[in-house]
Amino acid sequence: MSKRRIAPLTFLRRLLLRILAALAVFWGGGIALFSVVPVPFSAVMAERQISAWLGGEFGYVAHSDWVSMADISPWMGLAVITAEDQKFPEHWGFDVPAIEKALAHNERNESRIRGASTLSQQTAKNLFLWDGRSWVRKGLEAGLTLGIETVWSKKRILTVYLNIAEFGDGIFGVEAAAQRYFHKPASRLSVSEAALLAAVLPNPLRYKANAPSGYVRSRQAWIMRQMRQLGGESFMTRNQLN
């Protein structure tokens, strides 16, 4: 008796479901593991490293030094919250009003796309996913964001974010950035230094902390004003983030 042939669409559907199931197990395990274990590298770091090698840049090294929140200046945590996600302590991974505003803006200005990703979303993307703006990646990002918001504390999310965020070419994490740009550990970053590092986060490969443009300087000044308005270090203590 000949075996029944499986229709191509059925085969592809089953294959896709198996791949998604495997990814769910992999990512779920990663979320559980990295809730307590330092993150050795991120998907973005791996992507940058592989791209460099494929381009013949064999001297490129995606560098990161993991540090705990106790070894990071409270100004640094406050600076990235101020710059990227001021509602970070309040939401469950998504800033819905900001998303609605971004969608309305993008409909009117297709040439200048505005994002509304929270720190939680950026952490999920940087840690587990590839660069890009596809709806598939956005969907996966949403699921991963819910995962880390459910399993991790806000302090843990911020700690991981600060250790894997890209601050320049091959520079990942606030410790590597502090050593490269200011020749000091992240624990000793001042208000202005923290604000400068946060100011380049929209595009750290375009904006340079070691050669800040007028835009970066104005953004740095805005971040410092906003940090004061949020309450300075007391904001971090009040929200159990340091």
From Swiss-Prot:
GO terms for molecular function: pentosyltransferase activity; peptidoglycan glycosyltransferase activity. Signal peptide: none annotated. It catalyses: [GlcNAc-(1->4)-Mur2Ac(oyl-L-Ala-gamma-D-Glu-L-Lys-D-Ala-D-Ala)](n)-di-trans,octa-cis-undecaprenyl diphosphate + beta-D-GlcNAc-(1->4)-Mur2Ac(oyl-L-Ala-gamma-D-Glu-L-Lys-D-Ala-D-Ala)-di-trans,octa-cis-undecaprenyl diphosphate = [GlcNAc-(1->4)-Mur2Ac(oyl-L-Ala-gamma-D-Glu-L-Lys-D-Ala-D-Ala)](n+1)-di-trans,octa-cis-undecaprenyl diphosphate + di-trans,octa-cis-undecaprenyl diphosphate + H(+). Pathway: Cell wall biogenesis; peptidoglycan biosynthesis. SUPFAM superfamilies: Lysozyme-like (SSF53955). Keywords: Cell inner membrane, Cell membrane, Cell shape, Cell wall biogenesis/degradation, Glycosyltransferase, Membrane, Peptidoglycan synthesis, Transferase, Transmembrane, Transmembrane helix. GO terms for biological process: cell wall organization; peptidoglycan biosynthetic process; regulation of cell shape. The keyword Transferase applies. Its EC number is 2.4.99.28. It is a single-pass membrane protein. Its main location: membrane. The chain crosses the membrane at residues 19-39. The keyword Membrane applies. It is found in: Cell inner membrane. Gene3D superfamilies: Biosynthetic peptidoglycan transglycosylase-like (1.10.3810.10). Pfam families: Transgly. Belongs to the glycosyltransferase 51 family. Peptidoglycan polymerase that catalyzes glycan chain elongation from lipid-linked precursors. This is Biosynthetic peptidoglycan transglycosylase. It comes from Salmonella paratyphi A (strain AKU_12601).
